[in-house]
Design a protein with these regions (language model features):
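Flexible loop and strand-edge segments within Gram-negative outer membrane beta-barrel domains
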Residues: 1-85, 115-117
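Transmembrane beta-barrel strands of outer-membrane/channel proteins
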Residues: 2-6, 57-61, 86, 102-108, ...
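Outer-membrane beta-barrel signature, preferentially recognizing the C-terminal barrel domain
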Residues: 26-40, 48, 82, 150-151, ...
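Hydrophobic, lipid-facing positions within transmembrane beta-strands of outer-membrane proteins
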Residues: 39-43, 84-88, 125-129, 140, ...
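Residue-level signature of outer-membrane beta-barrel architecture
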Residues: 45-51, 92-94, 131-135, 146, ...
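Surface-exposed extracellular loop regions of Gram-negative outer-membrane beta-barrel proteins
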Residues: 53-63, 67-69, 99-107, 114, ...
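Gram-negative outer-membrane beta-barrel transporters
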Residues: 96-100, 134-139, 220, 224-228, ...
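C-terminal beta-signal and terminal closure region of outer-membrane beta-barrel proteins
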Residues: 248-249, 354-386
Length: 386
């Protein structure tokens, strides 16, 4: 199979600070805009060796190109990233209860920019294996992944899960997972922003889920979780990136149901995210979010909507800049014109609400980066039967 994606666009924005000249240390009036191009291509081949063994090989290449311009200035800044990837995944069904997943993956990132970076390429190699067991009384998962990063060395991460059915309609799932994330090139080296002394993030997560089939058309899923992050990469203030110790406690609930032949989903999330040293709330994470989705199909046509609420949050690590909560409403429609062609229409933020999810400071005052107001999005999906 083949997957191809290409997306291009242009963005204009306001810059109250003006264009800063590093040679003269003077700011000039500016009318900046960006042009971007995001593309990816991947090919895969899958082999059913026998009834028990399936093997899949995938190769990919992706590009994220961005150029910054100024209508009042002739120069430009380029920031282009490239990634080559390869993955080999093997699935062995030993019997109806035991399954083993094993594989390797490789990525190589490259950076081309008008800015000077200390490093402009690195690779990551990984090997992983996971065993799954599904029995009548319980089920288990146990996995191990070994990463070798050219810049940040080697790291082992584990994951495990235990599922316990209770009666015919309920199931408890207890899980544990470890994470590893290397800083990006921007985090490390971007001029006047990056911190070359950053460490890689490491995390441990614990979660307890309850899945209940309350009725034929009503399903409830709830979970409580805790994530502890060592050396989380966090923006502090004044272009300062640091590693901090963080802790996130959360509760999530999802009620999926059918009403008048329409599919509905009510989702609630409660999050308490803290810097473990200062006790402050982590930046730009709302404590409470609530959303409701409703979709109905009429033959080849579909309609739906999403209502979303988010509570206040803080923009900075010291919790001095408060971001107000907000609510939005989206509606959507779809039409499967032919077996191969589908058309989608989305009206986002139909009540044209003004809101922000991040802020900046200028002349001692705080201002919000404005999110999109009323937006119309039209898309087409072509899926040829080759």
């Amino acid at each position: 199979g083949v997957n191809v994606l290409d997306q291009r666009g242009k963005t204009e924005y306001d810059n109250p600070f003006g264009r800063f000249d590093m040679n003269t240390f003077t700011s000039f009036a500016a009318q900046p805009y960006d042009e971007y191009a995001v593309s990816s291509t991947s090919v895969f081949a899958e082999l059913q060796a026998n009834e028990q063994l399936t093997s899949r090989l995938e190769l990919g290449h992706s590009e994220d190109k961005g150029s910054s311009y100024d209508k009042l200035f002739s120069g430009r800044d380029d920031f282009d990233t490239y990634r080559d990837s390869a993955a080999w995944l093997n699935t062995l069904a030993i019997n109806t209860q035991h399954t083993v997943l094993a594989g390797v993956d490789y990525t190589k990132d490259k950076l081309h920019s008008t800015e000077d970076f200390e490093k402009d390429s690195r690779w990551n190699q990984a090997v992983f294996i996971q065993h799954s067991y599904k029995g009548e009384v319980f089920g288990t998962e146990l996995g191990l992944r070994h990463d070798k990063n050219q810049q940040f060395g080697s790291e082992n991460t584990w994951n495990a899960a235990l599922s316990l059915p209770v009666g015919q309609s309920n199931e408890f799932v207890l899980s544990y997972a470890e994470g590893f994330r290397a800083p990006t090139f921007n985090d490390l080296y971007y001029p006047m922003y990056g911190n070359p002394n950053l460490k890689a993030e490491k995390s441990k997560s614990y979660e307890l889920q309850l899945r209940s089939q309350l009725a034929d058309t009503v399903r409830l899923e709830t979970s409580i979780y805790q994530t502890k992050i060592r050396d989380q990469i966090q923006y502090q203030a004044n272009n300062d990136l640091r590693n901090v110790e963080a802790r996130i406690n959360g509760f999530e609930a999802s009620l999926q149901h059918e009403v008048f032949a329409a599919q509905g989903a009510l989702n609630l999330s409660l999050v308490d995210s803290r810097d473990r040293k200062t006790g402050h709330q982590l930046p730009r994470i709302a404590k409470r979010t609530l959303s409701y989705d409703l979709d109905k199909q009429f033959g080849a046509f579909g309609v739906g909507g999403t209502w979303r609420l988010a509570s206040k949050s803080f923009n900075d690590a010291k919790n001095n800049q408060q971001i107000a909560g907000f609510g939005t409403m989206d509606v959507r429609g779809s039409w499967q014109a032919t077996q191969d062609l589908g058309v989608d229409l989305r009206l986002a933020n139909i009540f044209d609400k003004g809101y922000t999810r991040a802020m900046y400071s200028y002349d001692g005052e705080s201002y919000g980066y404005r999110e999109d107001r009323f937006t119309v999005l039209l898309g087409m999906t072509w899926t040829p039967n080759l």
